[in-house]
Amino acid sequence: MRRAAHQIHDERPLVFDDPFALKILPADAREEIRRTPAASRKPFSAAMRSFMVCRARFAEDVLAAGVREHAIRQALILGAGLDTFGLRNPYPGLHVFEVDHPATQSWKRKLLADAKLDLPESLSFVPVDFERQSLRQQLLHAGFDFSIPTATAWLGVVPYLTLEAFAATARVLGRLPRGSSVVFDYSLPREALSPIEQLMLDSLSARVAQAGEPFQLFFTPESLPEELSCYDLSVAEDVDSAALNARYLASRSDGLHLRGRAGHLCHAAISSNGARQ
């Protein structure tokens, strides 16, 4: 919804241009976005949208660099939700694998069918029930090749995981060959925030907990490298709000701006010598 609102309510040039963000939504959701421009300008909404569009742009910038510099030929989108990169993929020879819970993926595929959006042959859907199925085995079953350099986007997922669940997926990603990348977002722990940011985190935490998806996992830029090293991953870039503002939101007059320091984006590289079986 926030990516879609960005397409119609924010000034040009867009931070993240996604022509399918509105098309994939149900008609009532599209109409709600169009008729409530004032809602998108509220501080909380603008702040959340700012982070989400910067996050998406950053992940696709890392992918683009990987295609140029490391011959990336697979894109893996974990917790894909309504991500539309598989429909927009501009890179010949790049295959996109979308991973999500079976129920969520079924819902998305119905939306795609309702919108009469054609699915390219370069897109594969991989349903995974993480409580009962192996991510690695489901990927292999779908034709994923662990010997091919891959760009992974793992967005909007990590803060909701237990450390055990994070580790299980990170181990799978650490088996990818050198040249592969993993982009994910994470949040600083409450004690690392200013008093006003703690209040904001408390409010947001209450919202997501009420929705049944509480925040569970936090890192700091100091603790993350050691954690990733356990899975043959290393931090290539850790980007905070100030860096995202400078990179993507400078000189804008539409209210898109990141405040505080809670949200970070991590671009992780593979530190092993190649794919392991």
PLM features: residue spans?
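Rossmann-like AdoMet/SAM-dependent catalytic core
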Residues: 21, 195-277
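Short coil/turn segments at beta-strand junctions that form active-site/ligand-binding loops
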Residues: 70-74, 146-149, 178-180, 262
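Conserved beta-strand signature within the Rossmann-like core of class I S-adenosyl-L-methionine
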Residues: 151, 170-191
